[in-house]
């Protein structure tokens, strides 16, 4: 997870590279910074993006040891709390909408309505740690279920939560 966060901070570059579609431009700017070996990933110039903040929220939910609906309520609570740490970050509109609809603690408060536009990759960006909780082959059904259910909390469209 640490290396994921470092890679995210590098790729994000304080909002400058997140949406840059030109690899040549990024490589040129990286060279202008003295190359990768001269980069010191630290605040304030190299923050992590919203993806890492939400990935950490996923890990915190999983770390509670809860299962079933209790775990899903924990995911919802962690995502809602994580959205309070978005200053200087660019969460996507699907993540913003989805988390605004979560009601952790309320019956089925971890479910949001289907979103025909919820096709981004945010759900995938924060789900890597789920495999750490369910690493064994016999746990595969749990891994898939928790991955889908946590993804649907913001990206409730098959393209979004299966991304």
What are these regions (language model features)?
Residues 1-163:
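Structured, active/binding-site neighborhoods that engage oxygen-rich ligands
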């Amino acid at each position: 997870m640490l290396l994921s966060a470092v890679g995210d901070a590098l790729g994000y570059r304080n909002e400058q590279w997140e949406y840059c579609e030109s690899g040549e431009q990024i490589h040129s700017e990286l060279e202008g910074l003295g190359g990768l070996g001269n980069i010191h990933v630290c605040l304030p110039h190299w923050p992590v993006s919203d993806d890492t903040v939400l990935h950490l929220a996923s890990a915190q939910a999983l770390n509670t040891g809860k299962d079933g609906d209790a775990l899903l309520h924990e995911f919802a609570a962690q995502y809602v709390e994580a959205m309070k740490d978005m200053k200087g970050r660019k969460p996507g509109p699907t993540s913003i909408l989805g988390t605004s609809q979560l009601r952790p603690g309320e019956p089925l408060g971890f479910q949001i309505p289907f979103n025909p536009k919820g096709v981004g990759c945010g759900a995938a960006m924060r789900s890597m740690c789920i495999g750490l909780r369910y690493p064994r082959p016999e746990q595969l059904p749990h891994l898939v279920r928790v991955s889908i259910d946590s993804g649907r909390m913001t990206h409730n469209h098959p393209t979004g939560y299966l991304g």
